[in-house]
Swiss-Prot record:
Organism, as annotated: Komagataella pastoris (Yeast)
Record protein name field: Vacuolar protein 8
InterPro entries on file: ARM-like, ARM-type_fold, Armadillo, Vac8
GO molecular function: protein-membrane adaptor activity
Spans of repeat ARM: 38-74, 75-115, 117-156, 158-197, 199-238, 242-281, 283-322, 324-364, 408-447
Keyword Membrane tagged: yes
Gene for this chain: VAC8
Biological processes per GO annotation: autophagosome assembly; nucleus-vacuole junction assembly
A family per Pfam: HEAT_EZ
Length: 556
């Protein structure tokens, strides 16, 4: 506050000045000097101190305006709390000044107050955006820096974001993101990031031409700028339309993000990986990330001890693994071992789910991959984990089991691993997806196998699940039960066939209460793995009738 004090004392002792000052201005200076000497006990936002500061603000003397602006800047730096319109009004008046020193200090004061949420809303409601936008375009770097910093703070408040997006602020912010002054660049890219949290605001950002600048700044040497830009682009890539636009206009984006996965800054690594994850929602990007050399970096990140990095990496590889052409490349790049290790993340369900989902994707289309999965210990780990896991993890694991059970060459290996001992309890889950996928896996394991010894050993429980599913009034469950019944009747095991015929004929397994239509909506079974290895309802009522007729024919 020394600057302000010395300025005020100059007016008090220099006899050449008094004629230039009005009486109320002299009184204000005198009062402020007293307040400043006891500043720790003075509330500058009320009564006398605020009146004295306001008097200087409305003075025509530029030196007094500067002193008021500097006083507001220093007071607000040390005392940030909700303020009234009476406090903000003189600061906003100072913001209208053509003097760079007044502008700089007034922007600083407003930026300090804009740390408080209620102040953020009040500043915008009082028309603070328009003068701030003007000051952003000032030729003075200090004014630019403080004005952009204030906008950055204002943009963290949800109520302000759409107003800022449509205020005309985005174009000057985009220009200032290219500033040679690092402080201005950081503030501008931070403000742009704050505008990426809603679809409408992201669209305004795209329309303002911000995306090419954000991509260009990925090559910045400053970790803060890199972080703001990668995070902003990650948010922008959430929208399908934006991903398509990025694909056609930013050919270097993927290679730059892949490089940033190797950054020395963990938060830059994390955001670059999340940006790639969002882009990999599209098939073309799933392939491009692999072509750009992204797999080695992702393997490294999966082995990180920093949990946010692990989560970002496993979410990214999960999306990349969706593309069939990437499956073998991912396995050959050494992903299986770290993915299996991630199943031990009991304190992070999201990591577990992404890891299992990736393993499931890798098993989708290749016998070689499915065998590699089995040999990696993934199935054994899932069997140990599943019964004590949250529903979300059970859902992913049961879907993975259903996919693996489709492979004829793996069925006996799966049965030998005692998978049936976890599938049977899962068929009683209250979650339709979990019990449906477990039942689908069981059904597949009962189909076309050379040895039914394990099935026979567990026949009593298998028949109970069949009976329960046939009485469920759920067409998907009925279809699974009928198909399982048919596979058992078509087996070459006479003991199983005899037991099943007896139960059907006695009504213990009833075919008389089946649905013949799927008009009922069973949303919790829509993601069950069907006989083709895809998510979706099994079949309609016609197939239930056909399966029933085949079964009745076989038990005659």
């Amino acid at each position: 506050m020394g600057v302000c004090c010395s300025c005020f004392k100059r007016y008090e002792h220099d006899q050449s000045y008094p004629p230039l000052l009005a009486e109320n201005e002299r009184e204000a200076i005198s009062s402020l000097l007293q307040y400043l000497e006891n500043r720790s006990e003075v509330d500058f936002f009320t009564d006398g101190p605020l009146r004295a500061l306001s008097t200087l603000v409305y003075s025509e003397n530029i030196d007094l305006q500067r002193s008021a602006a500097l006083a507001f800047a220093e007071v607000t730096e040390k005392d940030v709390r909700p303020v009234t319109r009476d406090v903000l009004e003189p600061i906003l008046i100072l913001l209208q000044s053509s003097d760079a020193e007044v502008q700089r200090a007034a922007c600083a004061a407003l930026g300090n107050l804009a740390v408080n949420d209620s102040n953020k809303v009040l500043i915008v409601n009082m028309g603070g955006l328009e003068p701030l936008i003007r000051q952003m375009m000032s030729p003075n770097i200090e004014v630019q820096c403080n004005a952009v910093g204030c906008i950055t703070n204002l943009a963290t408040q949800d109520q302000n974001k759409s107003k800022i997006a449509t205020s005309g602020a985005l174009i000057p912010l985009t220009k200032l993101a290219k500033s040679k002054d690092l402080r201005v660049q950081r503030n501008a890219t931070g403000a742009l990031l704050n505008m990426t949290h809603s679809l409408e605001n992201r669209q305004e950002l795209v329309n303002a031409g911000s995306v090419p600048i954000l991509v260009q700044l990925l090559s910045s040497t400053d970790p803060d700028v890199q972080y703001y830009c990668t995070t902003a682009l990650s948010n922008i890539a959430v929208d399908e339309g934006n991903r398509k636009k990025l694909a056609s206009t930013e050919p270097k984006l993927i290679s730059q993000l892949v490089q940033l996965m190797d950054s020395t800054s963990p938060r830059v690594q994390c955001q670059a990986t999340l940006a790639l994850r969002n882009l990999a929602s599209d098939a073309n990007y799933q392939l491009e990330i692999v072509r750009a050399g992204g797999l080695p970096n992702l393997v490294t990140l999966l082995n990180s001890t920093h949990q946010p990095l692990v989560l970002a990496a496993v979410a990214c590889i999960r999306n990349i693994s969706i593309h069939p052409l990437n499956e073998a490349l991912i396995i050959d790049a050494g992903f299986l071992k770290p993915l299996v290790s991630l199943l031990d993340y009991n304190d992070n369900v999201e990591i577990q789910c992404h890891a299992v989902s990736t393993l499931r994707n890798l098993a989708a289309s290749s016998e070689r991959n499915r065998l590699a999965l089995l040999e990696s210990g993934a199935v054994e780990k899932c069997e140990k984990l599943v019964l004590n896991s949250p529903i979300s993890v059970q859902s992913e694991i049961s879907a993975c089991f259903a996919i693996l059970a489709l492979a004829d060459d793996l069925k006996m290996k799966l049965l030998d691993s005692n998978i049936i001992e976890v599938l049977l309890p899962l068929t009683s889950s209250e979650n339709g997806e979990v019990c449906g996928n477990a039942a689908a896996a069981l059904a597949n394991l009962c189909s076309r196998i050379p040895d039914y010894t394990i099935i026979l050993k567990n026949y009593e429980q298998i028949s109970k699940f069949i009976a329960k599913f046939l009485n469920s009034q759920n067409p998907t469950f009925e279809h699974i039960a009928l198909w399982t019944t048919l596979q058992l009747l078509e087996s070459e095991d006479e003991t199983i066939k005899a037991k099943l015929k007896k139960q059907i004929n006695s009504g213990e397994i009833s075919l008389n209460n089946l649905t013949t239509s799927t008009l009922n909506n069973h949303s919790d079974t829509s993601n069950i793995i069907n006989n083709d290895g895809e998510e979706g309802e099994f079949n309609d009522g016609d197939d239930i009738i056909n399966l029933t007729q085949q079964i009745l024919e076989m038990i005659k």
